[in-house]
């Protein structure tokens, strides 16, 4: 199942469109959808954006230690949603490495330079399209 959601950055008048895909982490995607809308702060770690703790409860589900550009994931260790725009401080050349394993839940499908604008504790709302 694929489902569109959006991450709204009201401060910058920008929205990031995300296509959730439950093919790798169906329980996690279901938990995300059941908890929308979520209003939370988002932070920056290298070229990764990640939320503060969310009400989403999900354990590792086919968790990955390496992700692809524009992946969206859930980080069970931090109860956080992560958007990968590029490398993190622990990435290796040509590989995007999260802080610890993440459940892949979808992809960023809109083009935006939001990564350049976000500072730690930027407020966002994650909601259905």
Task: Locate each region found by the language model.
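Glycine-rich active-site loops that engage anionic ligands at enzyme catalytic sites
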Residues: 18, 22-129
């Amino acid at each position: 199942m694929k489902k569109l959601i959006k991450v709204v950055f009201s401060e910058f008048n920008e929205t990031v469109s995300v296509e959730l895909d439950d093919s790798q982490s169906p329980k996690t995607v279901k938990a995300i959808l059941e908890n929308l809308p979520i209003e939370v702060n988002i932070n920056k770690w290298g070229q990764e954006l990640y939320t503060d703790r969310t009400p989403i409860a999900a354990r590792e589900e086919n968790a990955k230690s390496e992700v692809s550009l524009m992946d969206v994931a859930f980080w069970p260790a931090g109860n956080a949603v992560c958007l990968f725009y590029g490398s993190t401080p622990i990435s290796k050349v040509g590989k995007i490495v999260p802080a610890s394993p993440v459940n892949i839940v979808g992809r960023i499908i809109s083009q935006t330079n939001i990564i350049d604008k976000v500072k730690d504790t930027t407020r966002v709302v994650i909601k259905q399209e």
